[in-house]
Amino acid sequence: MAQIFHRSTNTLSRLSIFGALFLVVGLLWLIATINRSSYVTEQNVTRAQPLPFSHDHHVGGLGIDCRYCHTSVEVSPFAGIPATAVCMNCHSQIWSTSEVLKPVRDSLKSDTPIRWTRVHNLADFAYFDHSIHVRKGVGCSTCHGPVDQMPLMWQAASLQMEWCLGCHR
């Protein structure tokens, strides 16, 4: 019987199959890499805020405990963003006329909360209870990183499931 295809066709077919396999594996690797990158997880990305609140100054410099501002962290699933009145506990006496704190004073006067940009944002299907973790002795820096060294807040961990499993295994 006569040969229909040239002998090099077998080589070409093998190269095509291995090339397609290499391309599929490469695309899967690329997708997995992008999914874990700071572009998706927003890890180590500083978020713009309505005013420059420095955890470095308040926690690191002045030694204010996280629970002074985030009062519900031990009893509620959510740590919460402090009310403007908490800021004014100190700033009605200290830096009370500072131009930087004008939005805080205006917020208190108008009884309108400051619209902070959320830094740590879990996926909608994930449930995280701050109070359980705090009562079990998990420190704030375990998840939030070195907050006492952050002039502006950023997300120190990826907060993806594989990161959580690092402790929960």
Which positions does each model-derived feature cover?
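Arginine residue identity/basic-tract feature
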Residues: 7, 14, 36, 47, ...
